[in-house]
């Protein structure tokens, strides 16, 4: 009760300035020179070779396909790739990696081959009364350890090019700002993914990334901006209604996302998702559903699967959840076999 009261009061009080800073000395995001900030990708499309910097930004920025007269970028990039500001004579990046805000190191992966992230670490930040997680990937060296309390600008490691699909020429920092989907990820991984999960709850599949560059740009305009306000202002692409069955951990952890009374009875929840699959709103719903059901979607003449990383399918004003979409809902709602969750 007291925790709920404290959280409610914290949301009603005037917002305190949130301290955020970019994680390297490359600040060209703020200078209007994105080509000097983002690391480009190598692209060959319809016989044309290019190196677009846009491929290092957040969102659907990779893997173009032609659909009639349209060219659609179909691959989702969940963070941003930041160029090195300086290199040694051999071309190795020298940039130190800095914490974007005060927090605690909660995960370190020093074995590059255990993730597409290569060597990476995760920091938990208490921002606006809630846990927000930052991910720093492809590092050459990690100097922080789990449990370390860090300040804004604390050194976490050094930029590198470990992980999948990256070499020395394209060395960069991959940065994400995320919500934790489930506190029981091991159960979901056992039920739906298989293999070995080396990263506990801090596996990349359990971290839902927001538009991190957009967050930094908006925060620069308004230093009192809360991350929660930024997330809930993200446009919804589709909504899914799920049966309401007992207490929902994600909604309890992110009460700021709930519109209406979390404790008021209702037969279902309606969850708003961005096109990338980030939850951006939760509403108690009077609708009766037997299983997760798409109840709203942005009207598009392009098949929804191309615009939502395959989470939903269909055209125009109608859509259904794909297998990937159903697995996302299972992760978000802890809807997986209890025996798997126990392992």
What are these regions (language model features)?
Residues 92-94, 98-141, 168-170, 174:
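Zn2+-dependent peptidoglycan hydrolase active-site motif and core
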């Amino acid at each position: 009760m007291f925790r709920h009261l404290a959280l409610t009061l914290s949301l009603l009080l005037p917002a305190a300035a949130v301290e955020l800073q970019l994680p390297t000395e490359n600040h060209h995001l703020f200078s209007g020179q994105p080509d000097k900030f983002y690391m480009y990708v190598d692209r060959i499309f319809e016989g044309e070779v290019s190196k677009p910097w846009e491929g290092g930004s957040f969102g659907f920025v990779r893997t173009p396909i032609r659909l009639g007269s349209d060219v659609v970028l179909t691959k989702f990039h969940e963070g941003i790739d930041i160029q090195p500001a300086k290199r040694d004579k051999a071309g190795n990046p020298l940039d130190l990696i800095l914490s974007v805000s005060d927090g605690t190191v909660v995960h370190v992966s020093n074995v590059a081959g255990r993730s597409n992230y290569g060597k990476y670490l995760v920091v938990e930040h208490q921002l606006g009364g809630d846990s927000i997680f930052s991910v720093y990937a492809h590092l050459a060296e990690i100097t922080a350890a789990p449990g370390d309390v860090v300040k804004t600008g604390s050194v976490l490691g050094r930029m590198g090019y470990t992980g999948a699909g990256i070499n020395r020429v394209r060395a960069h920092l991959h940065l994400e700002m995320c919500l934790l989907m489930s506190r029981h990820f091991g159960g979901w991984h056992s039920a739906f993914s298989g293999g070995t999960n080396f990263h506990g709850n801090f596996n990349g599949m359990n971290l839902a990334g927001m538009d991190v560059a957009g967050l930094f740009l908006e925060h620069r305009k308004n230093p009192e901006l809360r991350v929660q306000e930024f997330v809930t202002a993200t446009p919804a692409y589709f909504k899914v209604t799920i049966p309401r069955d007992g207490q929902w951990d994600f909604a309890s952890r992110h009460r700021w996302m709930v519109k209406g009374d979390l404790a008021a009875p209702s037969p279902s929840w309606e969850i708003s998702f961005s096109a990338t699959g980030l939850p951006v709103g939760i509403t108690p719903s009077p609708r009766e559903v037997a299983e997760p059901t798409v109840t709203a979607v942005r009207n598009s003449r392009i098949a929804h699967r191309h615009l939502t990383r395959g989470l939903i399918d269909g055209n125009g004003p109608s859509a259904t959840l794909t297998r990937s979409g159903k697995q996302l809902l299972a992760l978000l709602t802890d809807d997986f076999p209890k025996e798997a969750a126990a392992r």
